[in-house]
UniProtKB/Swiss-Prot annotation:
Protein name: tRNA (guanine-N(1)-)-methyltransferase
Keyword Acetylation: no
Species of provenance: Geobacillus kaustophilus (strain HTA426)
Complex and partners: Homodimer.
Subcellular location: Cytoplasm
Gene Ontology BP annotations: tRNA N1-guanine methylation
Binding site for S-adenosyl-L-methionine: G112, I132, G133, D134, Y135, I136, L137
PANTHER family: TRNA (GUANINE-N(1)-)-METHYLTRANSFERASE
GO terms for cellular component: cytosol
GO molecular function, one term: tRNA (guanine(37)-N1)-methyltransferase activity
C-alpha cells in the first residue's frame, strides 16, 4: 500500500512514522508512506495557500489550486486512489471504515487547516470526507495519524500475530474481553481461574461472554446492529434483570 499525506506541517509526523508498528511496516515494505508539503505546489510568488472567504466571514480558506495540483501530482498513474479529506463535517471514522480502506492500494490524506477547504475541493477532488470525532482540532494531521495507524496495522504481515487485529475491540463488532498476564496473583488481585484451566473451549466461551458483557455495560449502542445468537440474547436478558 502507498499512503500520501498532504500537509502544511510534515514535521508533525516524524515521531509517529519512525516508531513502533508504523516503522516496522515501512521496513517490511508493507506500506510506503510519503509526506507532501502542498505549500510547495502554490503557484504564487509567496507560496500562499489560503485566502479570505468570498462573502466575508472569520478565518482563512484553503485555496483549491495547491491542493488540486498536489493531488494530481501524487496520483499520476494511480487513477483509483482514494482521496480523503480530514474534516469535522466528514463521515465518522470507525473500525469498519479502517477495514475498508485497508483493502485499497493507494490512499491520499489531505490535512486541512485554517477555516476549512474551498468547496470545490470537496465537490470535484475528494472521494471521501472523514472525521475522527465530534470535536475541533487545529488541523487534520492528528486525524491522518489515526487513519494511518488503524489502517496499516490491518495490512497482511504487519502484526506478528495475524489473529491480533481480529481480536481487537470493534473488529468483531463488540468490545474486547478482559486480558490478563503474569503473575496470576498480584497483591491479592487474582486472574479468573477459568483462564488458568487450560480448557480452550471454556476459555473461548468466557471470552465471548465477557466481551458481550463489557459491550452491554459500556457501549450498548454497538448491540443495535449486532447479530446476536440465542445464547447471547439469553445472557443479555439475565444482565438486564440484574440491573432492575
Amino acid at each position: 500500500m502507498r499512503i500520501d499525506i498532504l500537509t502544511l506541517f510534515p514535521g508533525m509526523f516524524s515521531g509517529v512514522l519512525s516508531e513502533s508498528i508504523l516503522k516496522k511496516a515501512q521496513e517490511k515494505g508493507a506500506v510506503d508512506i510519503r509526506l507532501i508539503d502542498f505549500r510547495e505546489f502554490a503557484d504564487n510568488k509567496h507560496k500562499t495557500v489560503d485566502d479570505y472567504p468570498y462573502g466575508g466571514g472569520a478565518g482563512m480558506v484553503l485555496k483549491p489550486q495547491p491542493i488540486f495540483d498536489a493531488v494530481e501530482h501524487v496520483t499520476a498513474g494511480s487513477p483509483g486512489a482514494r482521496i480523503i479529506l480530514l474534516c469535522p463535517q466528514g463521515e465518522r471514522y470507525t473500525q469498519k471504515k479502517a477495514e475498508e480502506l485497508a483493502k485499497e492500494t493507494h490512499l491520499v490524506l489531505i490535512c486541512g487547516h485554517y477555516e476549512g477547504y474551498d468547496e470545490r475541493i470537496r465537490q470535484y477532488l475528494a472521494t471521501d470526507e472523514i472525521s475522527i470525532g465530534d470535536y475541533i482540532l487545529t488541523g487534520g494531521e492528528l486525524g491522518a495519524m489515526v487513519i494511518v495507524d488503524s489502517v496499516v496495522r490491518l495490512l497482511p504481515g504487519v502484526l506478528g500475530n495475524e489473529a491480533s487485529p481480529v481480536d481487537d475491540s470493534f473488529s468483531s463488532g463488540l468490545l474486547e474481553y478482559p486480558q490478563y498476564t503474569r503473575p496470576a496473583d498480584f497483591r491479592g488481585m487474582k486472574v479468573p481461574d477459568i483462564l488458568l484451566s487450560g480448557n480452550h473451549q471454556l476459555i473461548a466461551e468466557w471470552r465471548e461472554k465477557e466481551s458481550l458483557r463489557r459491550t452491554f455495560l459500556r457501549r450498548p449502542d454497538l448491540l443495535d446492529e449486532y447479530p446476536l445468537t440465542d445464547k447471547q440474547k439469553q445472557w443479555l436478558k439475565e444482565w438486564e434483570k440484574e440491573r432492575e
